[in-house]
């Protein structure tokens, strides 16, 4: 890390420790005398620790490699993957596996990283899932990069930005669609920040499989294409090309469609509403904090419930349209009931 210390000294806030799992030979010797075959797993974590042991709590480390102890790395992401529907499914499996390994903050590359550009629909569905994930990011190898052999006959156009995808497919209106999802992400930041605080306080992954919270429900034991995002949201990404609806399992309790506010009873399978933008459901008795049009809003789901808003240091209890707020906040908050 000493080679990079000058960057911290001039105010760099964080580092992305790409790679970290590469060794050139099983027979190579590490400095402690172990061979490549013996030390290749530990090397991954040593590579990351060289930075994480030196940076301050205010700095961030974004890594892809890890071994035993990876749960202590600030942020991990899924690494380079191709732009296919199967890879998107694998990315979600990786996220849920990471959560069960104690990894709190996790990310992936919207639309994939390598190979031919994703279809418009794959990019859309990948973006939707990223909105409801701990870290939202897109990036890719540069045009004609190291994975160009995956693109025989291609012109090398590989940039995964929304505007390049729109340009490549001749669909300028796609930019407005992407602006909607990126704006929604910005509006959800208060809820995401709250979820991150809970993750740190309780060692509870932000994005996690349903079995993490509903361990007595046999229907969720092997469920690998839905997840919880924080304590309030259940997300069921659309995984197939041009898919607009899917089967969704809702655990015990009442659940509200995040986009339409329609209420569903839990402990059953439902068909998601094809008119909704994405199958996302909010658990009754919980809250969602958002910032819309510059206004701080807290949405109260269900006929009664309670929640603590950590950023404002207030406790909320409601029954019907009667609400009790304990604590003081300098924020002007608008409460909205979803019943």
Set out the residue ranges of the language-model regions.
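Accessory, solvent-exposed terminal regions and/or long lumenal/extracellular loops of proteins
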Residues: 277-339
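Catalytic-domain carbohydrate-binding cleft regions of carbohydrate-active enzymes
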Residues: 1-277
